[in-house]
């Protein structure tokens, strides 16, 4: 049913990401799917809190953990953005199409008052992505 799972992550690894990682691993194991981890980071010099090498290492470590948990091949991709807050939703939706994902597994927080005005990232993907989206709370 699912062959390629896209797993968007916040590199600060809040609890929602860890829980969603468990779900992505279980679905990949059950479906025999591969996983691509996707992160969006800023390319503005004032916003660079981590080096490219540190980002690569963090994604590589997460990919190794996810591969061990799922038994599936796991790749990763970091997208550079001028304005992460404004562009992350579109970047994730485009990347899902580009890599041929047929499922997005994404963690989210409990709804806040602002989510009724501006959708969460998971809410945006659930509404706009052309593939299935599994939102993990």
Say what each PLM segment does.
Residues 20-22, 53-56, 89-92, 118-122:
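Charged helix-capping and loop-helix junction motifs
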Residues 103-128:
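Glycine-rich, Arg-bearing micro-motifs that act as flexible, cationic patches
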């Amino acid at each position: 049913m699912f062959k390629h799972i896209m797993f968007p992550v916040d590199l600060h690894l809040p609890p929602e990401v860890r829980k969603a990682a468990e779900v992505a691993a279980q679905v990949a194991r059950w479906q025999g799917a591969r996983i691509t981890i996707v992160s969006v980071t800023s390319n503005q010099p004032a916003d660079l809190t981590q080096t490219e090498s540190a980002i690569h290492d963090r994604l590589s470590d997460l990919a190794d953990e996810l591969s061990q948990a799922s038994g599936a091949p796991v790749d990763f991709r970091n997208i550079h953005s001028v304005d992460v807050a404004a562009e992350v939703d579109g970047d994730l939706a485009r990347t899902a199409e580009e890599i041929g994902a047929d499922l997005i597994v994404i963690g989210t927080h409990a709804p806040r008052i602002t989510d009724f005005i501006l959708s969460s990232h998971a809410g945006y993907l659930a509404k706009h992505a052309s593939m299935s989206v599994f939102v993990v709370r």
